[in-house]
Amino acid sequence: MKRPNNRPTNTMSLILCLTLSSLCVSSQSASVHGKNFATNRAVKSSSPFVVLSPDDNVVSMSGENGYRSALREAFDKSSRDYDDNGEDVFSNEKRRLRFHKRRLRFDRRDQDEGNFRRFPTNAVSMSADENSPFDLSNEDGAVYQRDLRAPRLRFYSLRKRAAGGMEQSEGQNPETESHSRRKRSVLTPSLSSLGESLESGISKRISINQDLKAITDMLLTEQIRERQRYLADLRQRLLEKGKRSSGVSLLTSNKDEEQRELLKAISNLLD
């Protein structure tokens, strides 16, 4: 029998050992970019304000001594901000990291070494538009931060309107003058104003009905009086005409019988 060939197995094991050794060597080494340093484990949790530049010098570390020297080199410029009191560098490592990140974020002095962009905290001077009729920072004297205030809209919210203080500024602007509180109350009245307007409308309607009834009664009374005067005048004329004709024609001729009967009927009707 032939002996089994173990060369492929030996080759695979050799490749695996070389790979593991290279991984171990790479995990023990790290790099420092300028004064902003981070290990492979701490890169994910680093602050977004720590910006690494490709122009920075890369310092390789080998062992504990290289790491200590990198730490001292990274914080030698900011050592004036603390008091070491002769202690070791690693005793205040976390505090130094926190202070370094805070200084990168909030320091307003000129940073010649860093390539990050500083965000101004007082954004009123940059965001306030003097020509904009909707910016109230200069008119009301209030200071608004860009990250804390609402976006600029044409109309303000009801909460700001109810708080007051914007009525005067709205009246000064020609574009928002038509939407002031005084004119808006006419377009959209409240419940109390609706009730008052309803009561006033009812009272006006009642007064108008009463006036119409009084006018109608007065006209009817005048018509009745005019009719009574007309009938009295007509009766008086008929009576006078009958008296004048009765003395001449009624006694001398029988032709006037019909007229006499007619006059009697008219006189009885008028009486």
From Swiss-Prot:
Residues 162-190 are annotated as: Disordered. Residues 29-95, 162-184 form a propeptide. Residues 1-28 form the signal peptide. GO terms for molecular function: hormone activity. Coiled coil: none annotated. Its main location: secreted. One of its GO terms (biological process) is neuropeptide signaling pathway. Pfam families: ELH. It is found in: Secreted. The modification Lysine amide is found at residue 241. Bag cell neurons. InterPro entries: ELH. One of its GO terms (cellular component) is extracellular region. Keywords: Amidation, Cleavage on pair of basic residues, Hormone, Neuropeptide, Secreted, Signal. ELH acts as a neurotransmitter locally, upon neurons of the abdominal ganglion and as a hormone by diffusing into the circulating hemolymph and modulating the activity of other organs. It specifically causes contraction of smooth muscle in the ovotestis and expulsion of the egg string. Belongs to the molluscan ELH family. This is ELH. It comes from Aplysia californica (California sea hare).
